[in-house]
């Protein structure tokens, strides 16, 4: 019960929480009003970096959402050329994470990490089409247990300036395992083959729990 009300936070949030807490204490001695505002901001920092446990649906027939947020695109596209898959057609689901969503990302399937590729870039609004090509991003090329290529892309947004990767090349992942996070508003794209989408544009998703696609 306690962990549902006060979930643990991601390690990336520790220093931000300490800094915000220290500033709050100082401001409370100077001004009750400023201290209260700072306290509210400290609570928001805690809320942003929360890392709640999820009930993972481990089923190789499904892909689960890699992110909390809102589905902004469901389409068929060429695979990402950055990982050498632009010669194949994939379906792609894009999920936008606003600053109030949990920003810890999870793998949509069980399988092996074949490649991780970081691409520096710009910081356009993550909901724009050009964000997939121009923004700072991190690619995870996975192979599911049936041999399908699944690619997850973390895309930094207008405010997000830090992509965190917690996964290694060659690592075997269980469905719903944490793979990283993005700070302060961002987007996750999932490219997949041989699955059919189960979500629609405008639908809210929960990482590790919402079923994105089915074989």
Predicted regions mapped to residue ranges:
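Contiguous, well-folded functional domains in the mature portion of proteins
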Residues: 1-215
């Amino acid at each position: 019960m306690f962990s549902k009300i006060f979930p643990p936070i991601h390690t990336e949030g520790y220093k931000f929480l300490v800094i915000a807490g220290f500033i709050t204490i100082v401001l409370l001695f100077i001004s009750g009003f400023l201290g209260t505002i700072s306290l509210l901001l400290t609570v928001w920092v805690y809320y942003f970096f929360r890392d709640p446990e999820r009930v993972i649906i481990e089923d190789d027939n499904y892909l689960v959402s890699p992110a909390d947020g809102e589905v902004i695109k469901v389409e068929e596209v060429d695979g990402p050329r950055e990982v050498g898959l632009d010669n194949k057609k994939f379906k792609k689901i894009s999920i936008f994470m606003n600053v109030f969503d949990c920003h810890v990302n999870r793998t949509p399937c069980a399988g092996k990490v074949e490649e991780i590729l970081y691409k520096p870039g710009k910081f356009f609004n993550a909901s724009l089409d050009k964000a997939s090509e121009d923004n700072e991003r991190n690619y995870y090329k996975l192979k599911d247990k049936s041999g399908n290529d699944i690619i997850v892309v973390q895309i930094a947004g207008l405010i997000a300036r830090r992509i965190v990767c917690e996964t290694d090349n060659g690592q075997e992942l269980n469905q719903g395992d944490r793979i990283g996070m993005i700070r302060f508003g961002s987007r996750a794209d999932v490219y997949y083959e041989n699955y059919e989408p189960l979500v629609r544009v405008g639908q809210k998703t929960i990482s590790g729990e919402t079923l994105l696609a089915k074989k």
